Amino acid sequence: MSGLIWDITERKIAEEQQALLAREVDHRAKNALAVVQAALRLTKASSLPEYIAVMEGRVSALARAQTLLARDRWSGADLRTLLDGELAPFLGSGQRALLDGPAVMLPAHTAQPLAMTLHELATNAVKYGALSSEAGHVSVTWTVEEMPSGVMLRLRWTEVGGPPLSSPPRRMGFGSRVLEGTIRS
């Protein structure tokens, strides 16, 4: 009598890891698509070309966050790198943004909402705020505070040199909803 025994433990572990990775990718893809769907529904524009431009900017912000997360294998995202990526399309070659704060690795689940928030702030600064004026600039500072419930990131977006604010906004647009949702989480 003879027999042959194969230890398939390593293969089973690899299969389980592959299945876990597939579920994680599926989950992240569904989350990203949900964000795109919300942006499609909530984006307002006066013309189709304007709508397309706004949506391309929002999808690009989401893609930049995805790329940053994938580069670090979804372990998190460096805040300064995220800020650089979101501000670069709006700043041109001039020194129009000051970034100041400690090194912060954002948890993966916060990188995309924060990227969308920063994109909306930068877009509004270009349209209505400091970056709509040649003399204007943006300052983004942040600190990290230890709280009983965990660590809290305090991020301050300050615009200087923009046009005076004539009146408060009349409606809550997609950007405001993104900001509100990000702040709550």
Segment roles from a protein language model:
Residues 20-34, 38, 42:
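Conserved phosphoacceptor histidine of two-component systems
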Residues 152, 165-185:
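ATP phosphate-binding glycine-rich loop and adjacent ATP-lid/helix-beta elements
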Residues 53-64, 68, 75-92, 141-143:
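Short beta-to-alpha transition helix within the HATPase_c
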Residues 6-17:
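PAS-associated C-terminal cap
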Residues 135-149:
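Short beta-strand/loop element within the Bergerat-fold HATPase_c
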Residues 3-5, 66:
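Sensory-domain boundary capping and coupling elements
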Residues 17-22, 91-138, 170:
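Conserved short strand/loop->alpha-helix "switch" segment adjacent to the catalytic nucleotide/phosphoryl-transfer site
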